């Protein structure tokens, strides 16, 4: 069976975001409002208003979904763990008509999961990128390639993407 030719391929980490709407906090800013800090009393139980779980996001996943919604045939090159959140990401992307055949599922690894502390009109994100063995799959050259956020161990992978694009 011939491989599908995509118009848009996004490359980057996929994540599930948990947006936690914080109820009470104090914000301390420098006099010029350039640097602000959200503060909670250490050791307190901090109430929150609500939490919204958004699977299959991140710069590259968002770009792939956006391209698909605009009518382009779109795929994502990414990695997920073999956990509930990985399956949920794959299902969400498939429902958005994003090709998932270039997403590697890694046994014994967790899917990236970030906590977004959302207070008033801003947010702070607690992030952790799993260290996946990044590998560029074989795919036909699309007119558009989007590369974004990857884990700290991805320097060699960046070179592989550069070499692919230059070939």
Language model regions located:
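Short C-terminal domain-edge/linker segments immediately following a structured domain
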Residues: 38-46, 107-109, 133-134, 156-158
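Small/polar loops that bind or transfer phosphate-bearing groups
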Residues: 77-78, 149
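Subtilisin-like peptidase catalytic core
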Residues: 81-84, 119
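Short glycine/serine/threonine-rich phosphate/pyrophosphate-binding segments
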Residues: 59-62, 85, 110, 155-157
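Conserved beta-strand and immediately adjacent loop positions that scaffold enzyme active sites
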Residues: 114
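Beta-strand->loop->alpha-helix junctions that form or flank phosphate-binding loops
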Residues: 78-82, 101-110
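Ribokinase/PfkB-type carbohydrate-kinase core domain
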Residues: 2-30, 52, 90-105, 117-167
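Glycine-rich phosphate/adenosyl-contacting loop at the front of the ribokinase-like
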Residues: 2-77, 87
């Amino acid at each position: 069976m011939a491989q599908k030719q995509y118009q848009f391929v996004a490359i980057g980490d996929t994540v599930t975001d948990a947006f936690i709407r914080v109820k009470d906090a104090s914000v301390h800013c420098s006099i010029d409002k350039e640097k602000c800090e959200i503060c909670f009393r250490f050791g307190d139980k901090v109430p929150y208003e609500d939490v919204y779980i958004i699977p299959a996001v991140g710069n590259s996943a968002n770009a792939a979904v956006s391209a698909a919604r605009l009518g382009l045939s779109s795929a994502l090159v990414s990695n997920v763990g073999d956990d509930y959140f990985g399956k949920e990401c794959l299902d969400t992307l498939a429902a958005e008509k994003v090709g998932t055949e270039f997403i590697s599922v890694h046994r014994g690894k967790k899917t990236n999961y970030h906590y977004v502390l959302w207070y008033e009109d801003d947010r702070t994100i607690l992030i952790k990128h799993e260290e996946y063995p990044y590998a560029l799959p074989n795919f036909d050259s699309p007119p558009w390639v989007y590369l974004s956020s990857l884990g700290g161990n991805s320097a060699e992978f960046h070179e592989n993407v550069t070499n692919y694009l230059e070939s």
